[in-house]
Swiss-Prot record:
This is one of the proteins that bind and probably mediate the attachment of the 5S RNA into the large ribosomal subunit, where it forms part of the central protuberance. The gene is rplR. Pfam families: Ribosomal_L18p. CDD domains: Ribosomal_L18_L5e. Belongs to the universal ribosomal protein uL18 family. This is Large ribosomal subunit protein uL18. It comes from Aeromonas salmonicida (strain A449). The lineage of its organism: Bacteria, Pseudomonadati, Pseudomonadota, Gammaproteobacteria, Aeromonadales. GO terms for biological process: translation. The keyword Acyltransferase does not apply.
Amino acid sequence: MDKKAARLRRATRARKKMQELGATRLVVHRTPRHIYAQVIAANGSEVLASASTVEKAISEALKYSGNADAATAVGKAIAERAIAKGVQNVSFDRSGFKYHGRVAALATAARDAGLQF
């Protein structure tokens, strides 16, 4: 099993548990250059809010989009957008990535901005 397959296996296991609980998810995906976050409804078919370093408003404020500072900006933006839609409580879906570095920075910023998980 290669690195990507192992990550996807971890992600599938976590998502199955969140589906059983019927939780709204804060999903994170990272690439070497960008980081993406989406708040997905409990039914799994509706994206309630999204933010990423690809967006012009966020990327213009950053020097580089692949570091912890960028993840912090995305975490703050996703929390503000989710709260504006009436979502306070979410389950953090790290998509099989380690809770470290950029993923942890995004989660911390989202918590500081008012999301609860």
